[in-house]
From Swiss-Prot:
Organism: Arabidopsis thaliana (Mouse-ear cress)
Compartments, record wording: Cell membrane
Organism lineage string: Eukaryota, Viridiplantae, Streptophyta, Embryophyta, Tracheophyta
Annotated effect of mutating residue 2 to A: Abolishes plasma membrane localization; enhances susceptibility to fungal and bacterial pathogens
Record-annotated site: Major phosphorylation site for BRI1: 230
Gene expressing this chain: BSK1
Result for mutant: residue 443 to Q: In bsk1-1; enhances susceptibility to fungal and bacterial pathogens
Role played: Serine/threonine kinase that acts as a positive regulator of brassinosteroid (BR) signaling downstream of the receptor kinase BRI1. Mediates signal transduction from BRI1 by functioning as substrate of BRI1. Functions as a positive regulator of plant immunity. May be involved in the regulation of pattern-triggered immunity (PTI) downstream of the flagellin receptor FLS2. Possesses kinase activity in vitro. Kinase activity is required for its function in innate immunity.
Signal peptide coordinates: none
PTM-bearing positions, type Phosphoserine: 230
Record note on quaternary structure: Interacts with BRI1. Interacts with ASK7/BIN2, BSK5, BSK6, BSK8 and BSK11. Interacts with FLS2.
Protein name (database record): Serine/threonine-protein kinase BSK1
Membrane topology summary: Lipid-anchor
C-alpha cells in the first residue's frame, strides 16, 4: 500500500497448574456480558463485573444452575444480536449471589467430546485481563455445552457505531477502542492464545465504566470442527477463504476491519475501503458525523494502520505489538473516563443511602467503613445468635468443646484484628457443622472483606441470611461485599432491605 501521508489533502489438560473445577456452591461467580455475533450480543442491563480483583476464579457450572440463572433460558434473556436466529445463543443471567453473567449456549453436538470442550474452556478461562470480558466458567452436562462470562452492561461497539440514538462515539473514544482491543489481542497472544475467531464490532463490549472489552467467546470456535467466521465473506481474511484456517495474521486482518468501522461509522467491505484509500478519497471514508471533530494527522495514522492490516499477503501485516505501539501515542484524552465520552451514567462508588434513618451499622456500611463495622460487630458479640444454635445435653462432646474453643480463638483474633487467623479459626468452627452461628458467618464475612476477598465475603453474608433470614446484619454485609464487587445497584438494594428489617425490629421484632 502506498503512503497515506497526503490522503486528506485531496491444548490444555484439566487440572494443569493445580487448577481444579469447583462446584458452584463454593464459587460465587459474578460479572458482566460477552458478545457473540452469529450470535453476537451486546446486552443492555444492570450489573457489572469490573476488572481485576472482582473477577471470580474459573470453574464448572451445572446445567441446573445456568437454567435457573437465565430463567429457563427465556427468550427475554437473549442478548445475541441475531436473537433466536443465531446458531449459538447468548443469554444474560443472574446467579444466586446477584451477579450478572453472559451464557453462551452451543447447538446440540457442536462439541460432542466433553473433554475436548472442557480443555478448550479451561485454556481460555486462565486468561484474566481488564481488556477482556473474561470467561469465568463452563458447563458440560450430557449433550449441553455452555460458556459463562462476565456480563458487559453497556452494549457493543456495533450498537454504538451503527445504531446509536442520542450521540455517536467521539473521535478520541474511537481511538481508545482501537487501542484497548489491540492491548487485549496482544495480551492473548503473549499468553499463548493468539487465535481469535470472527473479530468484529459485535465482539467489542463496554463495561460498567464504559471501557471497551474484547469478548472472550471469540477465543473458542463455535464448534469443534465448525467455521471460525460467521460474517459476510467480504470481510473474511483471504487466506481463510483459501484454506479455512485461522492464523494470528488472520486476526490482524479482522482487526483492520474493526479500524475501518471506527473510521467510517459504517460496516463497509475492506476491498471498497482499500479502493478509496488508494484513490486518496479518505474524506469519503470518514464518518460524516465526525466532520470537523477529528485530527487529520491521527486519522492518517489509523488509515495507514488499517491498510497494513488488510494486506493480501499475511506476512506483510503488523503483529499485535505493532498495533499497540502505533495506537498508544494517539491516546490524547487519557484523563477523561470512557463513560463520559460514551455519554453513559457512571455507577456510584458506594451504595446510596436509603431515605429512612440508618442504625450505626447501617451508616458504617453505607460509607463502606470497615473499621467502624468491625467495632460494632465486636460490641454486638453474639446477641443475635439466641435461638439459632440450641444444643441438647447429648451433643456436648469433646468435639463440641474443641469447636467452641476454635470459635473462642477466632473471637480473640477478631478483637485483635488478626483477620487471617480469625478466618482460620472460624472456618474450623463452621466446618464441624454441629452448631450454626449467623454471627460467625457475619464476622468471617468482614474478615474476608478486610483481606480483599469480596466474593468470599458475599458468600458468608448470604450464608448468614440462610441461617437467620431476617437478620439486618446479613443484608448489610451483603451490601458492602456487593459494592466491593462493583455491583452498586444491588448493593443499594441490599442496604435498603437491611434498613427496612431494622425498622421492623424497632417496631417489636426480634432483639438486635
Amino acid at each position: 500500500m502506498g503512503c497515506c501521508q497526503s490522503l486528506f489533502s485531496g491444548d490444555n489438560p484439566l487440572g494443569k497448574d493445580g487448577v481444579q473445577p469447583q462446584p458452584l456452591s463454593q464459587n460465587n461467580h459474578g460479572g458482566a456480558t460477552t458478545a457473540d455475533n452469529g450470535g453476537s450480543g451486546g446486552a443492555s442491563g444492570v450489573g457489572g463485573g469490573g476488572g481485576g480483583g472482582g473477577i471470580p476464579s474459573f470453574s464448572e457450572f451445572s446445567f441446573a444452575d445456568l437454567k435457573a440463572a437465565t430463567n429457563n433460558f427465556s427468550s427475554d434473556n437473549i442478548v445475541s444480536e441475531s436473537g433466536e436466529k443465531a446458531p449459538n445463543l447468548v443469554y444474560k443471567g443472574r446467579l444466586q449471589n446477584r451477579r450478572w453473567i453472559a451464557v453462551k449456549k452451543f447447538t446440540k453436538m457442536a462439541w460432542p467430546e466433553p473433554k475436548q470442550f472442557a480443555e478448550e474452556a479451561w485454556g481460555v478461562g486462565k486468561l484474566r485481563h481488564n481488556r477482556l470480558a473474561n470467561l469465568i466458567g463452563y458447563c458440560c452436562d450430557g449433550d449441553e455445552r455452555l460458556l459463562v462470562a462476565e456480563f458487559m452492561p453497556n452494549d457493543t461497539l456495533a450498537k454504538h457505531l451503527f445504531h446509536w440514538e442520542n450521540q455517536t462515539i467521539e473521535w478520541a473514544m474511537r481511538l481508545r477502542v482501537g487501542y484497548y482491543i489491540a492491548e487485549a489481542l496482544d495480551y492473548c497472544s503473549t499468553e499463548g492464545r493468539p487465535l481469535y475467531h470472527d473479530l468484529n464490532a459485535y465482539r467489542v463490549l463496554f463495561d460498567e465504566d464504559g471501557d471497551p472489552r474484547l469478548s472472550c467467546f471469540g477465543l473458542m470456535k463455535n464448534s469443534r470442527d465448525g467455521k471460525s467466521y460467521s460474517t459476510n465473506l467480504a470481510y473474511t481474511p483471504p487466506e481463510y477463504l483459501r484454506n479455512g484456517r485461522v492464523t494470528p495474521e488472520s486476526v490482524t486482518y479482522s482487526f483492520g476491519t474493526v479500524l475501518l468501522d471506527l473510521l467510517s461509522g459504517k460496516h463497509i467491505p475492506p476491498s471498497h475501503a482499500l479502493d478509496m484509500i488508494r484513490g486518496k478519497n479518505i474524506i469519503l471514508l470518514m464518518d460524516s458525523h465526525l466532520e470537523g471533530k477529528f485530527s487529520t494527522e491521527e486519522a492518517t495514522v489509523v488509515v495507514e494502520l488499517a491498510s497494513q492490516c488488510l494486506q493480501y499477503e499475511p506476512r506483510e501485516r503488523p503483529n499485535t505489538k505493532d498495533l499497540v505501539a502505533t495506537l498508544a501515542p494517539l491516546q490524547t484524552k487519557s484523563d477523561v473516563p470512557s463513560y463520559v465520552m460514551l455519554g453513559i451514567k457512571k455507577q456510584e462508588e458506594a451504595p446510596s443511602t436509603p431515605q429512612r434513618p440508618l442504625s450505626p451499622l447501617g451508616e458504617a456500611c453505607s460509607r463502606m467503613d470497615l473499621t467502624a463495622i468491625h467495632q460494632i460487630l465486636v460490641m454486638t458479640h453474639y446477641r443475635d445468635d439466641e435461638g439459632t444454635n440450641e444444643l441438647s445435653f447429648q451433643e456436648w462432646t469433646q468435639q463440641m468443646k474443641d469447636m467452641l474453643d476454635a470459635r473462642k480463638r477466632g473471637d480473640q483474633s477478631f478483637r485483635e484484628k488478626d483477620f487471617k487467623t480469625a478466618i482460620d479459626c472460624y472456618s474450623q468452627f463452621i466446618d464441624v457443622g454441629t452448631m450454626v452461628s449467623p454471627t460467625v458467618f457475619g464476622r468471617r464475612s468482614l474478615c474476608y472483606l478486610l483481606c480483599d476477598q469480596p466474593d468470599a465475603a458475599l458468600r458468608d453474608a448470604m450464608q448468614a441470611q440462610c441461617v437467620y433470614p431476617d437478620w439486618p446484619t446479613a443484608f448489610y454485609m451483603q451490601s458492602v461485599a456487593l459494592a466491593k464487587l462493583n455491583m452498586n445497584t444491588d448493593a443499594a438494594d441490599m442496604l435498603n432491605e437491611a434498613a427496612q428489617l431494622e425498622e421492623k425490629r424497632q417496631r417489636g421484632g426480634r432483639g438486635s
